[in-house]
């Protein structure tokens, strides 16, 4: 077997059972009925993973459009681009919702589909940030890093929660449902009125000592995002604690040990982001396309490993080598700058792209290995349906 799935755990794929709890009224009364009808445009011979990839293609097209018209993420673009982004994001959500419906419709649900779906979502968590950054005109700034942190943290928390509870929870207000719809509406409004009106309208002033702070609409959005992130974290912890408390096989002291052990699974992620914060504080010019993508692929790899460990019933993956990249970049930056006297901008350029190459390479290796192992053991194809499965 492969590096990421030992022989003793691959057989656990046979006991796979998807469980979810969706409390969203929007999803229940509007989106799910819409997806049930929309999925009939896909022929029964089409593999569900093709639908997932097709939806992701809309985001890729959006991002390519962003960097064609706004490579620095801080200028106005033609109004039609915002409408195209809204359409692309909505179609991504639609295809993402339909892949599971289609899989159940043709009896092709399985662990490979869940891995594929969540892995694409993890990459999209970073790519969609570029759309938001261009929409608001924030550029390659600390705000961009904070936006990515919020997206990846929410995704990591959700995956961590599912690992422990074996259930995917979507609350009354969640990012994959209401969050995406709000993004679509904001893109349409930006296309109509322009980013200055929607995102940078002055609202009020806050005085802190001798400092006067002007608050605009984007500041309010960031405040709401922070509030949502905190609520999501509390909800995830509450669901994990509840799961272990309700475990009939656990005594009180064992339950506390399990809860404490679960919390430790959050430490690697926040330690990783602490190293990122130190790096960009030390040298803000690291905030570049290559660096953002490096962080995104590292996050996707880490989440992917948690999903695989959940599906194959392995221990929680506490160590992930790509998470050491920012620390290595800090050390190499200091060495190159202090000992060898290399220009700062050259060091940043080289280290940013080196980090991107390493994170991308590891993620490709991981996905290739996992897809191979899953398809071999389950006797399925990744992007098509075996003829024996169609009969």
Curated annotation (Swiss-Prot):
Q: Which PANTHER family match?
A: BB IN A BOXCAR, ISOFORM C (PTHR10414:SF37), ETHANOLAMINEPHOSPHOTRANSFERASE (PTHR10414)
The family assignment reads: Belongs to the CDP-alcohol phosphatidyltransferase class-I family.
Q: Which domain of life is it from?
A: Eukaryota
Listed name of the protein = Choline/ethanolaminephosphotransferase 1
Which residue ranges traverse the bilayer?
Answer: 50-69, 173-193, 212-232, 265-282, 286-308, 322-342, 347-367
What exactly does this protein do? Catalyzes the final step in the CDP-ethanolamine route leading to phosphatidylethanolamine (PE). Can also catalyze the formation of phosphatidylcholine (PC) from CDP-choline, but does not substantially contribute to PC biosynthesis. Preferentially uses CDP-dimethylethanolamine and CDP-propanolamine as aminoalcohol substrates. Shows highest activity toward di-unsaturated diacylglycerol species as lipid substrates. The CDP-ethanolamine pathway may play a role in maintaining the proper PE species distribution.
What span is annotated as the signal peptide, if there is one?
none
**Any one Pfam family match given in the protein's UniProt record, by short name:** CDP-OH_P_transf
Q: Which UniProt keywords are present, listed alphabetically?
A: Golgi apparatus, Lipid biosynthesis, Lipid metabolism, Membrane, Multifunctional enzyme, Phospholipid biosynthesis, Phospholipid metabolism, Transferase, Transmembrane, Transmembrane helix
Q: In which pathway does it act?
A: Phospholipid metabolism; phosphatidylethanolamine biosynthesis; phosphatidylethanolamine from ethanolamine: step 3/3; Phospholipid metabolism; phosphatidylcholine biosynthesis; phosphatidylcholine from phosphocholine: step 2/2
* Chief localization: Golgi
One record GO biological process:
phosphatidylcholine biosynthetic process
User: Which ranges sit in the Lumenal compartment?
Assistant: 1-49, 194-211, 283-285, 343-346
A GO molecular function annotation here is:
diacylglycerol cholinephosphotransferase activity
Query: What is the taxonomic lineage of the source species?
Result: Eukaryota, Fungi, Dikarya, Ascomycota, Saccharomycotina
Topology relative to the lipid bilayer, per the entry, is: Multi-pass membrane protein
The residues exposed to the Cytoplasmic compartment are 70-172, 233-264, 309-321, 368-391
What this protein catalyses is: CDP-ethanolamine + a 1,2-diacyl-sn-glycerol = a 1,2-diacyl-sn-glycero-3-phosphoethanolamine + CMP + H(+); CDP-choline + a 1,2-diacyl-sn-glycerol = a 1,2-diacyl-sn-glycero-3-phosphocholine + CMP + H(+); CDP-N-methylethanolamine + a 1,2-diacyl-sn-glycerol = a 1,2-diacyl-sn-glycero-3-phospho-N-methylethanolamine + CMP + H(+); CDP-N,N-dimethylethanolamine + a 1,2-diacyl-sn-glycerol = a 1,2-diacyl-sn-glycero-3-phospho-N,N-dimethylethanolamine + CMP + H(+)
């Amino acid at each position: 077997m492969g590096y990421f799935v030992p022989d003793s755990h691959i057989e656990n794929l046979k006991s796979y059972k998807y469980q979810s709890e969706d409390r969203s009224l929007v999803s229940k009364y509007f989106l799910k009925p819409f997806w049930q009808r929309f999925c009939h445009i896909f022929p029964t011979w089409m593999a569900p993973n093709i639908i997932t990839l097709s939806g992701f293609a809309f985001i890729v097209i959006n991002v390519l459009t962003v960097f064609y018209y706004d490579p620095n993420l801080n200028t106005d673009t033609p109004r039609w681009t915002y409408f195209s982004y809204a359409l692309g994001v909505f179609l991504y959500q639609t295809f993402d919702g339909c892949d599971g419906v289609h899989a159940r419709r043709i009896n092709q649900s399985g662990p490979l589909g869940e891995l594929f779906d969540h892995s694409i979502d993890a990459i999209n968590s970073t790519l969609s940030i570029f759309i938001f950054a261009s929409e608001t005109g924030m550029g390659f700034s600390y705000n961009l890093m904070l936006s990515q942190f919020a997206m990846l943290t929410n995704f990591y928390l959700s995956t961590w929660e599912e690992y422990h509870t074996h259930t995917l929870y979507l609350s009354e207000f969640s990012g994959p449902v209401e969050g995406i719809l709000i993004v679509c509406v904001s893109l349409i409004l930006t296309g109509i009125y322009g980013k200055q009106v929607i995102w940078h309208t002055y609202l009020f002033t806050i005085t802190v000592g001798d400092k006067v702070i002007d608050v605009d609409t984007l500041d309010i959005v960031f405040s709401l995002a922070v509030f949502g992130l905190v609520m999501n974290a509390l909800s995830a912890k509450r669901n994990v604690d509840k799961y272990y408390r309700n475990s009939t096989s656990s005594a009180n002291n064992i339950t506390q040990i399990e809860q404490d052990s679960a919390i430790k699974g959050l430490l690697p992620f926040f330690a990783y982001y602490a190293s990122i914060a130190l790096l960009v504080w030390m040298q803000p010019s690291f905030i570049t396309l290559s660096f953002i993508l490096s962080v995104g692929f590292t996050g996707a790899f880490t989440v992917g490993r948690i999903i695989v460990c959940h599906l194959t019933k392995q221990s929680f993956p506490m160590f992930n080598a790509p998470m050491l990249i920012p620390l290595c970049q800090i050390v190499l930056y200091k060495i190159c700058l202090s000992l060898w006297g290399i220009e700062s901008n050259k060091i940043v350029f080289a280290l940013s792209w080196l980090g991107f190459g390493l994170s991308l390479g590891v993620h490709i290796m991981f996905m290739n290995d996992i897809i191979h192992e899953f398809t071999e053991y389950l006797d399925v194809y990744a992007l098509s349906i075996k003829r024996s499965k169609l009969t």
